[in-house]
């Protein structure tokens, strides 16, 4: 069989360790929230940025 660089079992183990560990989950949620706020800010400025020009 072909040796994959990243096997399915390694991906499952990574997912399990990131989701089911409370400390890592809290950090991941903070990161996702920050990413969402950034993306929302970019969309807001692209949509309504011309109204903010002085």
Swiss-Prot record:
Its main location: mitochondrion. It comes from Arabidopsis thaliana (Mouse-ear cress). This is Mitochondrial import receptor subunit TOM5 homolog. PANTHER family: MITOCHONDRIAL IMPORT RECEPTOR SUBUNIT TOM5 HOMOLOG. Forms part of the receptor complex that consists of at least 6 different proteins (TOM5, TOM6, TOM7, TOM20, TOM22/TOM9 and TOM40). A component of the complex responsible for the recognition and translocation of cytosolically synthesized mitochondrial preproteins. It is a single-pass membrane protein. InterPro entries: TOM5_viridi. The gene is TOM5. Keywords: Membrane, Mitochondrion, Mitochondrion outer membrane, Protein transport, Transmembrane, Transmembrane helix, Transport.
């Amino acid at each position: 069989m072909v040796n994959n660089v990243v096997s399915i079992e390694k991906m499952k183990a990574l997912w399990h360790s990131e989701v089911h560990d409370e400390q890592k989950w809290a950090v991941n949620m903070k990161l996702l929230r920050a990413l969402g706020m950034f993306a929302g800010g970019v969309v807001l400025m692209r949509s309504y940025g011309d109204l903010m020009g002085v």
